[in-house]
Amino acid sequence: MSRPVRNRKVVDYSQFQESDDADEDYGRDSGPPAKKIRSSPREAKNKRRSGKNSQEDSEDSEEKDVKTKKDDSHSAEDSEDEKEDHKNVRQQRQAASKAASKQREMLMEDVGSEEEQEEEDEAPFQEKDSGSDEDFLVEDDDDSDYGSSKKKNKKMVKKSKPERKEKKMPKPRLKATVTPSPVKGKGKVGRPTASKASKEKTPSPKEEDEEPESPLEKKASSSPPPEKSGDEGSEDDAQSGED
């Protein structure tokens, strides 16, 4: 590949050639031209950046100062507001406590007045019913005495029961007493019938409790009956058959 040929301009330096005197005059009149130091593009960029950064830093610092001032003002306002709020809350609490205490006092006064009225109303009723109340108390005492009397009666009944049992205990039967009967024929003693003997043998418990035994009967019971002869026994059998 062949490279393209560049266009080149031909410069004629003859046009710019002047006399030596002119050069000398020019050199005397004007001093050597001051050379300007060209700064590299990197340095220019750095300067621009540094300038921008400095401006940004200054703006940031100003904004920060403004913010700090605002914050200080806000904090002062907030502190004042908080103080006022605390004061308001305290005042509200104090007012609520005072109102509650007043309500309690009013209620206590109302209750006390009602109780006084009730006591005044109940006083005449109590005076009227005092006698009946005493009677009622006496009746209560009577009831208590009645309960104690019941207990005493129960104790007495319990004590009397064993005595009755002792009375009911069977006593030894008394032996039949032999009494002489009127003579029927030939002047001989007749023997009592079996029915009479049985009646005499079984006395009633009432009679046993009421009538004490006589000493004669005890002696007769202790002595054995007399023995009879054979003739008397036959006569007794005949009499029982006739009956």
Swiss-Prot record:
Sites where Phosphoserine occurs are at 14, 19, 54, 58, 61, 73, 75, 79, 113, 130, 132, 144, 181, 204, 214, 223, 229, 234, 240
Where are stretches of biased composition, namely Basic and acidic residues? 64-77, 197-206
Q: Name one GO biological process term.
A: interstrand cross-link repair
Q: Which InterPro entries match?
A: HR_DNA-Binding_Protein (IPR052003)
Task: List, as start-end ranges, the regions of compositional bias called Low complexity.
Answer: 91-100
GO MF, one example: single-stranded DNA binding
**Compositionally skewed regions (Acidic residues) per UniProt:** 111-124, 132-145, 232-243
Fill in the PTM field for this protein. Phosphorylated in an ATM-dependent manner in response to DNA damage. Phosphorylated by CDK1 and casein kinase.
**Compositional bias annotation for Basic residues:** 35-51, 149-174
The cellular component terms of Gene Ontology attached to this UniProt record, alphabetical and capped at eight, are: chromosome; cytoplasm; nucleus
**Transcription regulation in keyword set:** no
* Phosphotyrosine modified-residue sites: 13, 26
Any idea which residues bear Phosphothreonine here?
A: 179, 202
Alphabetized, the UniProt keywords read:
Chromosome, DNA damage, DNA repair, Nucleus, Phosphoprotein
Region annotated Disordered, chain positions: 1-243
Where is this chain's protein located in or outside the cell? Nucleus; Chromosome
Describe, as the record does, how this protein assembles with itself and its partners: Does not interact with RAD51.
* Known role: Chromatin-associated protein involved in DNA repair by promoting homologous recombination (HR). Binds double-stranded DNA (dsDNA) and secondary DNA structures, such as D-loop structures, but with less affinity than RAD51AP1.
The record's PANTHER family line, in alphabetical order, gives:
NUCLEAR UBIQUITOUS CASEIN AND CYCLIN-DEPENDENT KINASE SUBSTRATE 1, RAD51/NUKS-INTERACTING PROTEIN
* Name by which UniProt lists this protein: Nuclear ubiquitous casein and cyclin-dependent kinase substrate 1
Q: Which organism is it from?
A: Bos taurus (Bovine)
Q: Which gene encodes it?
A: NUCKS1
